[in-house]
């Protein structure tokens, strides 16, 4: 056992070093051929992919499974907190239907955040927050068409990601409250805004090596409690879960009647594809809802933005929730309006804005890009033409999915309890991860596809926007998911109700070819090569079962 344990440590150290290496480019599908050098490089990386997967898979077999991993036969949808949504698909507004919405926003920062004991959720390097630059919040909108089918909760938490386990803990608290007050809710959804410089909401930045080392012994002894040193991280999780439940309660109490409007907004002026594959004119548009209360009180905007929240650097050592905070702030200052921002198919999409920091203090300079980007996004929302009033028709469904990881790094992360996703074992002892996806439609005109992972734009909108870029030379066989329901335009929400890494098109999954070749480490945080096609197929099946 000691020899095997040493191999585990050695491999993880070597793998961490690999993440800092060099550059090779994917090729486009329409190219007639590939150079000999590219063929050699691809062959090398493909071989390396097999070696790495073989090594990590072997480590997973050596590493004891946590005692609370269950057999798939013991899986219970209600017990784990899955919600199926509404029973029927409404094709029009019934008499008496009307929109109502309530909003709430709370800080999720603990009072002792300045004491240097909480982790920033950026990477495995155990970065500690030394203070606060702006805030870290949960924002919630509760929406209903008052058809008697149940309301929908849309929540967004400033964070890199949220595990399904924690989302379902929030659900349990909300459902208990709703039962207590007699409030019917059909769907409870929480997204991570994907801010890279806030406290760790997922667990990925909390003492990786300590969990790796002590987790082996804990698992072998059947112990399920956290390893020593996790007290602050565990407290923060419980705190943001409690604050999220409280925010939903406040939003329910805030509900009032009004009108709901929709518009599509072009944010491409301030967004770019870091890979250079998606041209400005092909950057997907943003969906935006605007709720206007009958009482004349503050409006609420809900937007999905296809842009990474990486304008404020985690290297500052301060909690900063990036452009989301300043977009929210600008809307409030200008109109008093509320905001729920959920992430679109963010993939490698990032900011494209230049800020003149001449004359700024070091403190001002830190947040200059985030402030400017948030303000520009807010201006575009305020300038939008919200003249398209939506009929009070709300449709929502969810589908349970069971994912077999092709990337054993994800299994290892669960084995060492780096993340707390629930894992079940099939009859052959293979790990399965339960998760979910959803479909949320407004007015029979526009909808959100709710996805448990971080989609690349081309995986959702089809790879024409990347000129058919492929790693393995095959084609991506799916059309845009945005047109899956006739008469409805659909937009993606990523990292919602779970955080299962990146979702590329199957044919452009290169793993080490991108990690080493292009210094893009996304695929180390992916379920595997076929995650894209798996989710797309499950999505179409969900739609076919619901929209009849």
Set out the residue ranges of the language-model regions.
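Glycan-recognition surfaces in beta-rich domains, encompassing non-catalytic CBMs
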Residues: 381
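Anionic-ligand-binding alpha/beta catalytic cores of soluble enzymes and soluble regulatory domains
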Residues: 377
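Conserved beta-alpha junction segments in alpha/beta enzyme cores
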Residues: 33-191, 195-372, 385-548
């Amino acid at each position: 056992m000691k020899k095997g344990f040493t191999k585990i440590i050695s491999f993880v150290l070597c793998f961490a070093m690999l993440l800092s290496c060099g550059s090779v480019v994917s090729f486009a599908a329409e190219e007639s051929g590939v150079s000999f050098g590219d063929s050699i490089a691809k062959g090398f990386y493909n071989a390396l992919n097999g070696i790495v997967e073989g090594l990590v898979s072997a480590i997973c077999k050596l590493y004891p499974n946590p005692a609370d991993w269950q057999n798939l036969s013991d899986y219970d949808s209600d017990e784990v907190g899955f919600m199926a949504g509404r029973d029927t698909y409404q094709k029009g507004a019934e008499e008496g239907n009307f929109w109502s919405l309530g909003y709430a926003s709370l800080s999720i920062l603990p009072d002792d955040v300045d004491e240097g004991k909480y982790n920033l959720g950026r990477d495995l390097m155990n970065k500690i927050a030394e203070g606060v630059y702006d805030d870290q919040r949960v924002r919630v909108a509760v929406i209903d068409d008052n058809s008697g089918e149940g309301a929908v909760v849309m929540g967004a938490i400033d964070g890199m990601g949220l595990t399904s386990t924690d989302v379902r803990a929030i659900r349990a608290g909300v459902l208990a409250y709703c039962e207590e007050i007699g409030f019917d809710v059909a769907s409870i959804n929480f997204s991570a805004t994907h801010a890279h410089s806030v406290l760790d909401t997922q667990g990925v930045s909390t003492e990786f090596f300590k969990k790796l080392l002590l987790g082996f012994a804990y698992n072998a002894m059947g112990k399920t409690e956290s390893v020593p040193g996790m007290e602050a991280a565990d407290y923060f999780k419980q705190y943001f879960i409690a604050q999220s439940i409280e925010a939903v309660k406040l939003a329910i109490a805030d509900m009032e009647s009004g009108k709901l409007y929709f518009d599509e907004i072009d944010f491409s002026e301030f967004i770019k594809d870091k890979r250079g594959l998606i041209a400005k004119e092909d950057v997907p548009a943003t969906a935006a809802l605007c709720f206007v209360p009958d009482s004349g009180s503050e409006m609420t905007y809900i937007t999905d933005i296809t842009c990474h929240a990486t304008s404020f650097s985690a290297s500052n050592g301060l909690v900063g929730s990036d452009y989301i905070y300043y977009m929210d702030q600008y809307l409030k200052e200008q109109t008093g309006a509320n905001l729920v921002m959920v992430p679109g198919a963010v993939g490698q999409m990032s900011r494209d804005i230049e800020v003149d920091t001449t004359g700024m203090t070091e403190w001002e300079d830190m947040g200059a890009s985030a402030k400017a980007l948030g303000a520009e996004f807010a201006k575009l929302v305020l300038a939008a033409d919200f003249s398209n009033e939506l009929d009070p028709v709300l449709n929502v469904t969810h589908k349970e999915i069971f994912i077999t990881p092709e990337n054993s790094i994800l299994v290892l992360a669960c084995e060492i309890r780096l993340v707390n996703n629930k894992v079940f074992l099939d009859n052959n002892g293979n790990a399965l991860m339960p998760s979910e996806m959803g479909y949320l439609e407004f007015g029979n005109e526009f909808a959100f596809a709710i996805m448990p992972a971080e989609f690349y734009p081309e995986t959702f909108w089809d790879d024409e926007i990347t000129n058919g870029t492929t790693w393995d030379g095959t084609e991506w066989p799916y059309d845009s998911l945005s047109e899956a329901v006739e008469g409805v335009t659909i937009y993606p929400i990523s990292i919602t109700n779970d955080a299962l890494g990146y979702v590329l098109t199957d044919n452009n999954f290169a793993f080490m070819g991108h990690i080493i070749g292009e210094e893009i480490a996304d695929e180390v945080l992916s379920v595997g090569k076929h995650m894209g096609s798996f989710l797309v197929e499950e999505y179409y099946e969900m739609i076919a079962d619901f929209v009849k």
